[in-house]
Amino acid sequence: MKPTIVCFSHLRWNFTFQRPNHLMSHFARERRVFYIEEPILGASTSTIEVEVIGDGLTVCTPHLIDDSRWRAESEQARLIRAFLLEQGVENPLLWFYTPMALPLAEGIRSSAVVYDCMDELSMFLGAPPELMAREQELMTRA
């Protein structure tokens, strides 16, 4: 059986049909795919909204109470690990579209890591200062 893919993306699934949508939809024909979106902050409780897009493809949107980046990353990582455990996911292939999601995968034992760098995110207006360091770390792991 092919490993489950856990995809971390900076793009909302329903924003516009782009490379992540195309590839993850294709992969979902043969394996489970969990597409993890960036969180929505300011929720009354921390949770993961789950939307089944089709056979094998599930979009997960974390909703977080706290708006502190560090606490938000920590809480999001906890929610993702708990969700994957509930789903029986073991040794997934971790697929990243943004290096900023790297801390979210802490504690997840993976079969492989893919960094699909489709944009020069460091050139975007408002790019976080730690983006380049995380990208270098992700390149080392992939």
Predicted regions and their residues:
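N-terminal subdomain of nucleotide-sugar transferases
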Residues: 1-44
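Active-site proximal beta-strand in glycosyltransferases
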Residues: 32, 95, 107-122
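Short, well-ordered alpha-helix to beta-strand connector turns
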Residues: 2, 30-31, 91, 110-111, ...
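Membrane-proximal helix-turn-helix segments that form the acceptor-binding/catalytic region
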Residues: 23, 128-142
